[in-house]
Amino acid sequence: YEVHLILKGSVIVGIFTGNPKDEPLHYGEVFSIWTNLATGYGMIAGYQTFYNHAGDQDLKKIIEDFIQCARDEVKQLEKILKTNGVALPPAPPERPEARIENIPPGARFNDPEISAALSMDAAAGLVSCSQVMGMAIREDIGLLYAQFHTAKAQLGAKLLRLNKEKGWLIPPPLHVHHPLH
């Protein structure tokens, strides 16, 4: 990468030029990518566990979509960290498939619980992606997280629709406007 330094008053200002991928990551970008990668590893294992516990076939399909989304993100984040000489965080092992009948009913996550956890993850993921998009100075990092954001928003919309169809959505108190007479 090429850095041009310009002296303005008593402050040196760095101006990056050329391909953003040739620019160094700043510490916030490194920390965010590393943290998101560690989180992605954990989510894959957690979603595999949810898949084993889920009984509803529509929910299982969405869980597969969440796993694939996380795997896609992990692959891209690993590449960025490796390219920039940053050690990868540890990853839990993949979860083996289990038969739902072999999980005792009291020890099993039920479908509405799984769906609620996925909804929470989708919402938190949107916030996390937005935060990285806002602090990134490398255009490629900001755009990558914009892609992650879009994928999470689409998964969240599918999940919301499923929650409504299955009757799993527990709405907060609703504000209903009643006209004054």
Show which residues each predicted segment covers.
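Active-site flanking loop/helix segments enriched in acidic
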Residues: 16-18, 30
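Alpha-helical scaffold segments that form or flank carboxylate-/histidine-based iron centers
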Residues: 25-33, 57-75, 111-114, 139-153
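Preference for long, well-ordered alpha-helical segments
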Residues: 121-181
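Short, Lys/Arg-enriched N-terminal segments with co-localized hydrophobic residues
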Residues: 1-12
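Carboxylate-rich helix-loop segments that flank metal/cofactor sites and access channels
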Residues: 12-16, 79-116, 120, 171-181
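Acidic/histidine-rich alpha-helical segments that form the ligand environment
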Residues: 29-51, 100-147
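Conserved alpha-helical segments that form or flank metal/cofactor-binding pockets of metalloenzymes
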Residues: 57-93, 155-166
